């Protein structure tokens, strides 16, 4: 990829997705966009850029999708899910006993392993959640990964990464070399396309937000804006889970670290003021039909 084409793609990706490519990521652009160019019948990246400049919106969407699809696997990093099971959910069951409703958001959910891991955690609670209204909203910028997530079909390699064998046996059905999540787990998650750069107040408010391993790709200003918007849709006693390499320190004062649980953050009280009701008054968001 030439320096001029690389700079064009950097600006395009920043504007469309917030992805902040450093000056030394040519290898990443080449590894992801050369196959895309060839599928489009083009010799290489130079021709791909030329076609984009000619006004191909469909191709722009494919470029953004190819560059923003990130690695994911079941129960990634394990610790946030341990916190969810052992302390976060039990505390929320007490705090929400009056309205018996929970809303959880998995942002940048990719092919679905994270929201489905959350769903299995909730399913494991059994009778403790009987009679509760539980919503898990999974969002991603990419339509392609959302389609895969909805199907809930995973390869042998995918289910071997992080998924305990007892959960594989309990919640999946094997079909040849593939594994499909059982319908009851799939039904717990609602999938929707969303760009984190845009307003997301229409989602309503949440008790737990997982926004993990995506903010590392944004610059400081973009991160600060996302944190400010996240604070407005998280309940005052809610929990934000970030990735192991992510932090709010030096970026935003909208959240403070939970001193006892690594990777979890609480809204700063002064930053949680917002218009409208809480999660109990939020409209239910249904999976987008396309």
Residue ranges and their predicted role:
Residues 84, 209, 234:
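Residue-level signal for inorganic ion chemistry
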Residues 107, 127-210, 214-225, 247-249:
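Extended basic-aromatic, gly/pro-enriched interface segments that bind polyanionic ligands
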Residues 224-236:
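A short glycine-rich, Lys/Arg-flanked "PGG" loop and its adjoining helix->strand segment in the class I
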Residues 111-129:
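Conserved SAM-binding loop of SAM-dependent methyltransferases across substrates and taxa
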Residues 236-244:
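Conserved beta-strand signature within the Rossmann-like core of class I S-adenosyl-L-methionine
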Residues 1-105:
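Conserved AdoMet
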Residues 251-290:
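Core SAM-dependent methyltransferase catalytic element
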């Amino acid at each position: 990829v030439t320096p001029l084409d690389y700079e064009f793609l950097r600006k395009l990706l920043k504007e469309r997705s917030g992805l902040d490519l450093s000056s030394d990521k040519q290898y990443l652009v080449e590894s992801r966009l050369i196959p895309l160019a060839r599928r489009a019948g083009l010799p290489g990246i130079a021709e791909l850029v030329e076609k984009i400049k000619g006004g191909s919106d469909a191709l722009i969407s494919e470029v953004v999708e190819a560059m923003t699809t990130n690695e994911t696997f079941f129960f990634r990093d394990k610790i946030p899910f341990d916190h969810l099971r052992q302390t976060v959910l039990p505390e929320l069951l007490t705090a929400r006993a009056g309205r018996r409703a929970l809303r959880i958001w998995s942002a940048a959910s990719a092919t679905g392993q994270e929201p489905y891991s959350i769903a299995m955690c909730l399913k494991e609670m059994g009778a403790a959640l009987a009679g509760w209204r539980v919503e898990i909203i999974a969002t991603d910028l990419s339509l392609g990964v959302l389609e895969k997530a909805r199907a809930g079909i995973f390869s042998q390699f995918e289910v071997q990464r992080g998924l305990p064998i007892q959960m594989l046996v309990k919640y999946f059905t094997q079909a040849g070399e593939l594994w499909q999540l059982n319908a009851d787990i799939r039904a717990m998650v609602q999938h929707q396309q969303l760009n984190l750069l845009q307003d997301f107040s229409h989602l309503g408010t949440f008790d737990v937000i997982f926004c993990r391993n995506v903010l590392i790709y944004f610059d400081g200003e973009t991160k600060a804006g996302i944190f400010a918007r996240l604070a407005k849709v998280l309940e005052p006693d809610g929990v934000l889970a970030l990735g192991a390499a992510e932090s709010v320190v030096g970026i935003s004062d909208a959240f403070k670290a939970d001193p006892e649980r690594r990777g979890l953050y609480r809204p700063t009280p002064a930053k949680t003021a917002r218009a409208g009701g809480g999660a109990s008054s939020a409209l239910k968001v249904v999976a987008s039909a396309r």
